[in-house]
Amino acid sequence: MAMNKTKKLTTVAMLFALAIVLSFAESMVMPMFALPPGVKLGLGNVVVMYCMVYLGYSSAFQVTLLKGFFSFLTRGFTAGVLSTMGGLFSITIMFILIKLLKDKVNYYTLSVFGALFHNLGQLAGISIMFANTAPLAYLPVLTVSAVVMGLVTGATLKVVIPALKRL
């Protein structure tokens, strides 16, 4: 069933707020774990995946840009660029996977590839910003973390889908 414009706008706004709250909560909890620099769970991206699967690319794009802008406002230029680049790479691969694989794609596949491409987008952003390819040396660490964290966020999405569908 299609949503009217007002309901879709308010749903996207609530999902953006939820993504910000999840990201903030994650930033409070994750420092308790001894993880390599730059490795995060990405709970806010669970919301973006939900948008992609249930509301479409446009809504996922809107939430991604809003998250990037919020990062820019609260953490500065570099964080805003990295959030936006990672998010755009991530939703692009998810869109491609959904279009190519249709019903064969699952939350775990979307999440792992989304995490991998999020990391690639951030590495591309930092390499462009500093005109240096040295950050690419961190790719093996980020690849392993993307697979692990992607599986966790995929499982998280699967668990929270019933609650999110009620929005």
Features from the language model and the residues they span:
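Alpha-helical transmembrane segments of multipass membrane proteins
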Residues: 19-23, 71, 90, 94, ...
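Generic transmembrane alpha-helix motif of multi-pass integral membrane proteins
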Residues: 43-57, 93-98
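Residue-level signature of transmembrane alpha-helical entry/exit and packing/kink sites
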Residues: 4-15, 41, 45, 60, ...
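Hydrophobic transmembrane alpha-helices
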Residues: 2-50
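Active-site-flanking alpha-helical
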Residues: 51, 74, 125
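Short helix-perturbing small/polar motifs within transmembrane alpha-helices
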Residues: 14-16, 21, 63, 84-117
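Interfacial aromatic-anchored transmembrane helix boundaries in multi-pass membrane proteins
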Residues: 23-42, 66-94, 107, 129, ...
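Membrane-embedded alpha-helical hairpins and interfacial helices in multi-pass inner-membrane proteins
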Residues: 37, 77-84, 100-167
